[in-house]
Curated annotation (Swiss-Prot):
<feature type="region of interest" description="Putative zinc finger 1">
    <location>
        <begin position="4"/>
        <end position="34"/>
    </location>
</feature>
<dbReference type="InterPro" id="IPR005735">
    <property type="entry name" value="Znf_LSD1"/>
</dbReference>
<dbReference type="Pfam" id="PF06943">
    <property type="entry name" value="zf-LSD1"/>
</dbReference>
<feature type="region of interest" description="Putative zinc finger 3">
    <location>
        <begin position="82"/>
        <end position="112"/>
    </location>
</feature>
<feature type="region of interest" description="Putative zinc finger 2">
    <location>
        <begin position="44"/>
        <end position="74"/>
    </location>
</feature>
<protein>
    <recommendedName>
        <fullName>Protein LOL4</fullName>
    </recommendedName>
</protein>
<dbReference type="GO" id="GO:0005634">
    <property type="term" value="C:nucleus"/>
</dbReference>
<dbReference type="InterPro" id="IPR040319">
    <property type="entry name" value="LSD1-like"/>
</dbReference>
<comment type="function">
    <text>Putative zinc finger that may be involved in programmed cell death and defense response.</text>
</comment>
<keyword id="KW-0539">Nucleus</keyword>
Amino acid sequence: MQDQLICSGCRRVVQYRRGVAGVCCPGCNTLTAVNPSAVADMSELICSGCPTLLFYNRGASNIRCPSCNRLNSTRSANQIAHLTCGQCRTTLMHPPGASTVQCATCRYVNHVRDARPQTVLVENPKTLDDKGKLVSNVVVGVTSWKR
């Protein structure tokens, strides 16, 4: 199982295997100690105002982005999906339903393959047919939310 921490040298997000005492950043070679209790109490989300990855304590209800100053609600943080960049193999987070995700490391545009199809029900107002009967206008379809 893997986890993530922020490098104490360059502030990049670094992945590591759970159970290790320290992580060497591949970008700047800084050794960052792993604090198991702090990692277990942390969560992450992507800022709703910019593409910044934010880390916060699980008990927090809101977190302010240091990049764009937007206040983010942590209630929807569990609605994050992950994929691996097809070019540099970096783990990326994205909102469910996204059709593409651009990697912040190498700028490669990744197509989300597992965008789950969803059933959509559209109910328009009832109308009268040529005989004066009230008719329902309901359409059912399936979409993957790709635009």
